From Swiss-Prot:
This is Large ribosomal subunit protein uL15. One of its GO terms (cellular component) is cytosolic large ribosomal subunit. It comes from Bacillus cereus (strain G9842). GO terms for molecular function: rRNA binding; structural constituent of ribosome. It comes from the Bacteria.
Amino acid sequence: MKLHELKPAEGSRKVRNRVGRGIGSGNGKTAGKGHKGQNARSGGGVRLGFEGGQTPLFRRLPKRGFTNINRKEFTIVNLSTLNRFEDGTEVTPELLLETGVISKLNDGVKILASGAVEKKLTVKAHKFSSSAKEAIEAAGGSVEVI
């Protein structure tokens, strides 16, 4: 391979199609818009979701549920991620934030029992699943609900 033999990858360089520039281009005169009608006009076209007057899908489907304004969203931390801390560490939401285990606190931290914990840790969080609580205590650690 020599410098003058280099070619761009097949299909990576596409020439822009200039419409309305003469009959010989194949896209002259009507510029690919056909004859008359809403879509041939400048600024023409139908709004999003319009189905030609037929009742649109978003109106045919029923409404469902509601948004609970009191919903609490907990940041989830699994037991397997707690193994990165040294034995005897007090694991708090602030520590999890500064070590980059979680990116934001939301409404608190919930510890779930995915994986296993091998270290003796004092874990402080807003919520624990019952199996996570048992696993931490079985490993010799302690659990504290904030």
